[in-house]
Amino acid sequence: MSSDQHLQVSKIQAGTVIDHIPAGQALQVLQILGTNGASDDQITVGMNVTSERHHRKDIVKIEGRELSQDEVDVLSLIAPDATINIVRDYEVDEKRRVDRPDVVAGVLSCPNPNCITANDEPVRSGFDVLDDGMRCQYCEQIVSEDIPSLIDPE
């Protein structure tokens, strides 16, 4: 394929590139990161991009922002094969794969209205990460879908 058959996306000066996101999941990644386009963050999203390794993938570039470990942990739940590239001065300075944590604490809220974490108790939420979802450490509710909607905004 000749170079004029590729759409070129400009490099970012500094920020994060999230690569190898499962095809069709980029918008969920943006939701997890709390980015809705209303901020000043310059964001580039590529969806269903051809990939040798995954056949199709999504990619997200965020100018001027490096992800926290909590954000990477939640991201790993929907994109376990993602790669996080930290860009500084237009070059990849750090490159790492996401690791699914054993526990996610204080990031997600339990959907069970009877859970102690859903009430106004001073209890930090905690979820055990399973192969097919997550389990609340308090009420044992299993969550496997719509994880972005459970992100605690606080």
Swiss-Prot record:
GO terms for biological process: 'de novo' pyrimidine nucleobase biosynthetic process; pyrimidine nucleotide biosynthetic process. It holds the Pfam family PyrI_C. One of its GO terms (molecular function) is metal ion binding. Binds 1 zinc ion per subunit. Zn(2+) binds at residues 110, 115, 136, 139. The keyword Metal-binding applies. Keywords: Metal-binding, Plasmid, Pyrimidine biosynthesis, Zinc. InterPro entries: Asp_carbamoyltransf_reg_N, Asp_carbamoylTrfase_reg, Asp_carbamoyltrfase_reg_C, Asp_carbatrfase_reg_C_sf, Asp_carbatrfase_reg_N_sf. SUPFAM superfamilies: Aspartate carbamoyltransferase, Regulatory-chain, C-terminal domain (SSF57825), Aspartate carbamoyltransferase, Regulatory-chain, N-terminal domain (SSF54893). Gene3D superfamilies: Aspartate carbamoyltransferase regulatory subunit, C-terminal domain, Aspartate carbamoyltransferase regulatory subunit, N-terminal domain. The keyword Metal-binding applies. Its cofactor is Zn(2+). GO terms for cellular component: aspartate carbamoyltransferase complex. Belongs to the PyrI family. Contains catalytic and regulatory chains. NCBIfam families: ATCase_reg. Involved in allosteric regulation of aspartate carbamoyltransferase. This is Aspartate carbamoyltransferase regulatory chain. It comes from Halobacterium salinarum (strain ATCC 700922 / JCM 11081 / NRC-1) (Halobacterium halobium).
